[in-house]
Amino acid sequence: ELTFNGETYTVPKNPQRIAVLSNSVLSMLYAVDGKAVSRASTTDKLATELEALPALGQTANINMEQLLGLKPDVVLGLENQHKKYESQLQSNNIPAVLFNYDGIKDNVPMLTFLGELTNHQDKAKSVIATYESNIQKVKDAIKNQQPARIAVLRATGKGVTAETDEAVTASMVKELGMTNVVTSHLDG
């Protein structure tokens, strides 16, 4: 059993066939030297090793037949995207870890979890140390600057949205001490 943010998951001791339904989780898995048997479809540029993995469809619309055909030991996904597949995975006796990922504050716990899952705890600790060191370097580099007032906008083919501090990019901005005018406008 492994724990992530208070949730306990029953997973195989040494999983060899890890199916991943989200490329953000996939990137973290590979950061700790884990290996996967799948990825989500994307137009984003992926490392060659990740690009070579079978794509199971878009993150929110996974091809379950293809996933089950991979015979995974465990499936990693996101609760808000993949909960709908949980009962089908259970009926096929496939353990699933559906992370309730809540932005950058969950990066360290997720890296720790993935290190434990893959028995690469030392690699996870090393990645976390580098991650935290890099964040501190940026904070130190800007500590004497007047905090910027910014708005994080996301443009898609369907429109433009403004991010609150709950979104990943805007939460990074907040971590660096900048003021998100979208959030301050909502608060005021």
Predicted regions and their residues:
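Stable alpha-helical elements in mature extracytoplasmic
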Residues: V25-M28, N63, Q81-Y85, N107-M110, ...
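Short, structured coil segments at secondary-structure junctions
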Residues: V32-D33, N92-N93, L176
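A short, structured surface patch at a secondary-structure boundary
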Residues: V20-L70, V74, E79
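Extracytoplasmic ligand-binding site segments that recognize negatively charged/polar headgroups
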Residues: N100-F113, P147-M172
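Charged, glycine-enriched surface loops/patches
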Residues: E86-Q121
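Solvent-exposed loop/turn segments at secondary-structure junctions
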Residues: S24-S27, T42-K45, Q81-K83, D102-D106, ...
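Alpha-helical, coiled-coil/dimerization segments enriched in small aliphatic residues
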Residues: T42-L46, T161-G188
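Bacterial Sec-exported substrate-binding components of ABC uptake systems
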Residues: E1-S24, D122-L153
